[in-house]
Amino acid sequence: LDAGVIYPISDRTWVSPVHCVPKKGGMTVVKNEKDELIPTRTITGHRMCIDYRKLNAASRKDHFPLPFIDQMLERLANHPYYCLLDGYSGFFQIPIHPNDQEKTTFTCPYGTFAYKRMPFGLCNAPATFQRCMTSIFSDLIEEMVEVFMDDFSVYGPSFSSCLLNLGRVLTRCEETNLVLNWEKCHFMVKEGIVLGHKI
C-alpha cells in the first residue's frame, strides 16, 4: 500500500485468490538420520502468489516475442568489457490503465485489493514488459545493449566505448523513469553471467 503498487477495493467481478509459496534460497548440506550429507535448498521466506488462472483464461493472448537467447549471447561474445544491469521490481514498473486495474483484484486475510502496477502471474505480463523494454531501448539494442526482460547487458569494443554506451543506457533509464537494482548491477566487468550463461 505504502509503495503505491496496490490499493483497497470493494469486491469486483474479477477476484483472484492468494497463495503463499516458499521463497527458495541457496543450497546447503544437511545430515540425515544415517549421518549422510544431503544437499538441501534453503527457504528464505515466503512469496505471495495470486492465482490469475480464471482471468488468464479469459484474456486475449499477446504473442510479442522474447529475444532468442542464443542470438543475444552471440552478439555479446568477445567484447572486452560489460555492464550487467538489473531492473528493480521489473513488472511493478509498468502502470496498469485505470480501467483495467480492477481486473487484478485479489483477496487475502487483510482485505481486497487491486494493482496499480503490473503484477506477476498475468499471462501477458512477460510480453507487455518485453515490448516496453524493447520500445525504450529500440535504437540501442544490438548496437550497445541486449535486453531480456529486466536484464540489460551493455557492451563495447573498448573500455571507453563501453563506458560511453553505459552512459547512453543510463540516460535512457533516467529519461523513462526506469529504476535499476544497483545491488545486482555489475559495472565494467570482463566476464559475467547473462541468463545463466557465462560471457
Question: At which residue positions do the language-model features occur?
Answer:
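Retroelement reverse transcriptase polymerase core
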Residues: 1-199
